[in-house]
């Protein structure tokens, strides 16, 4: 527990952070403790599995909790709530207006946005090379200034391997605030697009969802937000064939009158041949730059049929060596993508027109 001096009730119901419960054979206890000691992990024997069909907890030799297995299986009293998914504002949720009169002013304003600017100072506080498994550093290129959108790590194994895990996340708080349904759907798409842009196939991805919402009240509108988000994510799971195998939720995102935006953040992971992974930085002057466009449906939802075709096309082109750099267009639009792809090797880009540099953030574009 986080605090000392807790009474028996507090100990029984307290939440333990950064802990892991492991069930082992009694005969393996000493061997297991030895392994933990080798990894400098504190381990404590806290319970035994019995055939009494009761969960009993003791504190200082005194029985303080005694619950039947049948009661635990019932999950307690049933709760019911009404949910109402509210209508959304009639507008283009992807359109952004960037301040500035000239192209230079707009580019600088876009790159200075809190959701676009570099987080290198924060990232450098963490060691990305631990375990000698890192395939892509957080920033790539000769100058190490092109932002990487995925985490790629070779699998820990004895001997040599080219198999790596590749993971990315997706979430846009502005889109989710406009519509939790759309926000969750595009969170799934965003993570898949980043993985594809780095050289992996999307169709074997598995997800974990991190959900964080305001405190639930008696208002059906508050319950409608997590319901809408889960429906949006489920729709993408079904249409893209990408299941979520875990997750975590919290409904305590309220402080006085301040609520967190509706959040369903999608973390997607799959495997990839490390030799096929590509970075975001431009490699050579004279290379052509293409936008593989995703056009949302009239209701602003992802066109999953088009996305699957685009993802397959890009993956095949990367595997054949035709694509050497990739970036999933995000909050800052194509303008952000071109700038960040340029920084790594100091190689610029000539855009055909300002239209192609707009800072709209249509998700799923590569």
Question: Model-found features: residue ranges?
Answer:
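Glycine/proline-enriched, intrinsically flexible loops and inter-domain linkers
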Residues: 1-358, 363
